[in-house]
Amino acid sequence: MRRAVIIPARLGSTRLKEKPLKNLLGKPLIRWVVEGLVKTGERVILATDSERVKEVVEDLCEVFLTPSDLPSGSDRVLYVVRDLDVDLIINYQGDEPFVYEEDIKLIFRELEKGERVVTLARKDKEAYERPEDVKVVLDREGYALYFSRSPIPYFRKNDTFYPLKHVGIYGFRKETLMEFGAMPPSKLEQIEGLEQLRLLENGIKIKVLITENYYHGVDTEEDLKIVEEKLKNL
């Protein structure tokens, strides 16, 4: 099956100015992301609204210029996918410099087996109370029951259950991604500010794979410092 990893990257980030171009150990953040994904051997496409961002990575991967007024990263991916000859897509966040080939391959493998949507989560106690970290709870077969910024599940008794932090990397079958794009925003999606709830509210299952790999997206200057320290030790 034909497949591609698409990275949405908007220059005008609201929380961190010109985030894709932020210097990270001598390289722009977006170049870290693209270089890591290119090493997986997959087809890599950057979807950006900026010529400046394009220039940083066009020697590494395909680049599609998209309108600047698209409301979200998902819309940017959809803009590219509509006319793309692919069957399976991974939407990889442009602010996530940690890339693990085994996780990319695993997501594609699940899609090839017939899953419609696949994502990742990892055990993380520290994320439990932080609203900026999205938590997920699963059913017995590894499908998402719910995603929330609130601490879920609630621990009525002190036990050894570890909360799962959602890693915002998504694999889609193309037809499911197009279906998602045609759906209006859902009630729970608007309440939590989480697009993936639109899928659950419309009865589309999301397979969640548990990874032990470290991920840390960059949204603030503090995140940038944390990521720099981690990358130094790789």
Curated annotation (Swiss-Prot):
Molecular function GO labels: 3-deoxy-manno-octulosonate cytidylyltransferase activity
EC number of the protein: 2.7.7.38
GO process terms (BP): CMP-keto-3-deoxy-D-manno-octulosonic acid biosynthetic process; lipopolysaccharide biosynthetic process
InterPro entries associated with the record: Cytidylyl_trans (IPR003329), KdsB (IPR004528), Nucleotide-diphossugar_trans (IPR029044)
Pfam annotation, one family: CTP_transf_3
Main location: cytoplasm
The keyword Cytoplasm belongs to this UniProt entry's keyword annotation: yes
Catalytic reaction(s) noted: 3-deoxy-alpha-D-manno-oct-2-ulosonate + CTP = CMP-3-deoxy-beta-D-manno-octulosonate + diphosphate
One GO cellular component term noted in the UniProt record for this chain: cytosol
Enzyme class: transferase
Family per similarity comment: Belongs to the KdsB family.
Protein name: 3-deoxy-manno-octulosonate cytidylyltransferase
